[in-house]
């Protein structure tokens, strides 16, 4: 965004958080120019998608836990731990399935639900359990270890848009995102 601000000083971005189930319609109506999210098989034919990066789910937990000795975390490794789930109300099917693959056998008392990734990380930092999040630009937490989940799928994360034909700023925004892809994970 900093580079975009320099190239387009009159551009006035509006950043919104919408459930992935809603942004396709907003893009169709041109109520917004672009949306970032996980690739969905239900993408409308009139919309385009450019992949920015591919990501697995990460397991984050207190660095003092025995899990920190492992490089890759399996579902078996999580048997004795509560799981902190990211649940913003309306959740991406990708995030939902990625988390529930590891949480489905837990008792309700072993599950914590958080509306933001920051809250999930805060609970993990306080020792309530482990959190499972897409490994995308996660805020650093000094006392948390981060490990890859075994057997987890790799998910495509990118930008959805209707057209950038008459919107050079949008084309440049997508190009800048792709150039900065290394910083997403």
Give the location of each predicted region.
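Short beta-strand->loop
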Residues: 48-58, 131-135, 142-157
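Central regulatory/effector-binding core of bacterial HTH transcription factors
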Residues: 1-42, 113-114
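Ligand-binding cleft/hinge of the Venus flytrap
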Residues: 1-9, 76-77, 93-108
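A ligand-binding cleft/hinge motif common to bilobed small-molecule-binding domains
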Residues: 24, 38-45, 95-96, 117-145
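Secondary-structure junction motif
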Residues: 38, 81-104, 171, 184
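Flexible hinge/capping segments at coil-to-helix
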Residues: 46-57, 61-83, 168-171
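Short loop/turn segments at beta->alpha junctions
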Residues: 19, 74, 115-116, 134
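A late-sequence structural motif
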Residues: 146-185
């Amino acid at each position: 965004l900093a580079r975009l601000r320099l190239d387009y000083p009159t551009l006035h971005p509006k950043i919104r958080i919408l459930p992935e189930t809603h942004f396709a319609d907003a893009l169709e109506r041109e109520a917004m120019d672009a949306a970032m999210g996980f690739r969905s098989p239900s993408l409308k034919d009139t919309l385009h998608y450019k992949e920015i990066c591919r990501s697995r789910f990460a397991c984050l937990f207190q660095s003092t836990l025995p899990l920190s000795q492992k490089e890759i975390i399996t579902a078996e490794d999580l048997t004795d731990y509560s799981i902190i789930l990211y649940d913003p109300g309306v959740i991406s099917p990708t995030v939902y399935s990625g988390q529930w693959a590891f949480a489905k056998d837990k008792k309700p008392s072993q599950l914590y639900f958080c509306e933001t990734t920051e809250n999930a990380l805060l609970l993990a930092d306080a020792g309530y359990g482990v959190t499972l999040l897409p490994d995308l630009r996660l805020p650093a937490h000094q006392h948390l270890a981060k490990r890859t989940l075994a057997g987890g799928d790799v998910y495509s994360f990118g930008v959805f848009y209707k057209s950038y034909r008459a919107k050079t700023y949008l084309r440049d925004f997508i190009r800048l995102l792709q150039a900065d892809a290394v910083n997403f994970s």
